[in-house]
Structure formats: C-alpha cells, structure tokens
Amino acid sequence: MQNSAQAPQKKGSKHFWGFPFTHFTYFFMWQIIFGYLTLWMEQVGHMNGAEAGVVFSAMAGLSLLFQPAFGVISDKLLFKKNLLFTISIAAMLIGPYFQWVFLPLMSINSMLVAIVTGIYLCFIFNGGVSVIEQYVQRASLANGFEYGHSRMGGSLAGMVASFVGGQIFLWQPNSIFWACTISATILTGLLLFSDKVDLENASAAGDTSNSLDLSLIGKIFKLKNFWYLSIFYIGTSAIYDVFDQQFIIFFKSFFNSAAAGTQAYSYMTTAQIGLEFLLMFPMPWIINRIGSRNGLIAYGVILAIRIVGSALSPSLIWVVFLRLLAGFEMPLVLVSIMKYIAGAFDVRVYATVYALASNFAKQISVFIFSAVAGNLYDAIGFHHTYLILGAIVAVVTLFAVFALKKENPVQAGERDESGKAKS
C-alpha cells in the first residue's frame, strides 16, 4: 500500500486561527458533558445507577459502529464539511433536548430515554471526536501549521469548562447544556466562515479526487504496521484510561477525610491540565526532531513509569509528582499519533486508520480491561493491580520499539523536502 501525497507542498497559508477555536468549542462541550452529565442525571434527571449505566453503555457500544463508519466517510469527504456540520448542528440541540425532551419523557419511559440519550451523545462525541481531529490534522498539512498548536485550544477548553461548568451547574443545573448549545453554535459559525483550507496544497493531506474505493480501505487490514499500532494503543492508551478510572479512590486513600482528598485531587488535576496546555506549544517542535514513532515510544515509557511508580510510591508527594507526568503524556501521544499515521500510512485513508487503530481498538479494550481491573482492585488491591497494568504497558512499549515501522518524516510534516526539521 503506497503512501500518497508526495507532491511538494507550497508555502503554508495564513489560515490557522479558526482551528484552535474549533478545538476549543468542541472540547468545551466534551468536558462539560463528561464532567457533569453523571451528576446532572442523578440530581436533576433522577436516574438510578442502572439507568445512568445504560446511557454510558450505549455511548460506548455505539461508538464501535460510529467510529469506523465516520472514519471511512471522512476519508471520502476529505475537506468537505457535510459530516462536520451534521455533528455541530446536532450539538446545537443539546440544550433543547435535555430541557424539553429528556425530563418530560423520563416520566413516561426512563429506560427508553437512557438509550436514546446514549445514541444521541455518542453520535456527537464518541463518534464525532475523530471527525473533528482528523479534519484539523488534514487542514494542518494543507495549510502548513502544526496540529499541536491548534490542539492547545482543546486543552484550554478543558480548564475553562471544568471551572465554568461547576459554577453554572451550581447556579442552574440545566445551564450546562445551554452552554453546550452556545458553544456548538459558535462551532458551526467557525466551520462556515473561519476554517479555511488551502486547497492548492490538498495533496499534502491525501488527494481523494479519484474515487476512494473500499478495496483501498480493505488493504489496511493486510498491513502489519496497522495491527502493530493497534496493539500499541490497546496496551498503552486503553490502560491509561483504565488506570485513571478509579485513580481518585486510590488518591483519596492518602487523606484522613474524603472531602480533603477530593479537594486536593481537583487542584492536582487542574495543575495537570495546565501543564498539558503549556506543553502543547513546544511539543510539535520536539516531535519534529525526535520523530513521531519515537514520540509514541516515549509516551509508553513515561506511562509505564507513572503506573508502576504510583504502585510503589512511599508518600503522597510521589503520587502527585507521578500524576503530573500525565501532563507530558497527553501532548506526546496527541501530537505523535497524528503525525505518525500521516507519515506511516497512505494519507488517503488517514481518518480510517485513526478511527480504527486509536479509537475503535481502544474502546473495545477499555470495555474489557475496565471489568478485569475492577475485579483485580477488589481482589488484590490498587498497588498490585497497578504493577500488573504497568507491566503490560512496559511489555507493549518494548514490542513497539521493534515492531512499529519508521514514518516518512516529510509526509508526516516533521521535515521539509531538504530533510531539515520544521520549526
């Protein structure tokens, strides 16, 4: 399967600033929903644990359908915004849905509402996230800017939404959803008027002027490197999510009161997100010099150290220090995976590879690992479970050192035609 997009790229265009705001508006909604939905469903929606579980199960299950489908559609559409507009317009209805549809229907059939809500939110978020991400990455290749610099908008949105969401939830719980509606409206406006792509450089992001047939997509599954990348993501990023799921319980065990532990955790998380935001700016410069494959391996090494270190930490100070390493991990993996897929695969199927290797495989693994890890926490405790999780990450990272092929640095946007690292 030959890589495309070898044509020299023209000088980068000036179109950049709309994309960080696109990232900001989308991930503002993301943080609001995943940060406060559970609390709202309990306090306002009066859902029990089983009903709330159905919402998240539907989101997780249907993501296995939406993610690969959206990947193929995105590769077909390339820079056309049909799917992006569908997602942003659907997000504009979040406020009206939860205010005027969800609550009245809860009194009629609560389980049906839970299923419909899961489908609706999965379409916008679990499926939609890869559509947003791959579009901005492709735009970065065509326009000549760094994806990581745009992604800073998403990191900033996480900090802003965490703070603003808590304040407006206390003021009026339903207002969190109207904040999403406002953000989605701005996102739609950005897609309409601001997010411009230099189509003269479209070949740098995969020229699909010729029909993208299913046989090309089918060849992905015959590539060893695709399976190696999937294994790497399963053994690192899926473990990352599983490790984080109940970390707050482990963290609070170092405190005499749950309230003190919760407050300290919020401060630590804010510091971690702030560090992530700051490191997003220099990370593309770093990855351009070390290579995206090496960036992925560095991510795996740091993650293994953090998980094993947490298990062996003698005091709270070490736990906090190791937790802050996550601020390094996210910029590393977000920038590296985007560049690696662009440089190691045919960019015409960029979105499909991204959706399948880094989202689809990860979702299945998180679903399986979450149950296994939960049982291990109860059976052998956090410390021993963390040692097992850390060992898995270490083994998979070592495997990647020998298995993952080197990317094409020019196609990945790491170096120019002369071989010089981009600044």
Model-derived features: where do they sit?
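A membrane-interface helix-boundary motif in multi-pass transporters
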Residues: Q167-A184, N375-V393
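Helix-loop boundary and gating motifs at the non-cytosolic
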Residues: A7-A60, L64, N225-F255
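Cytoplasmic helix-loop-helix junction between adjacent transmembrane helices
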Residues: I119-G154
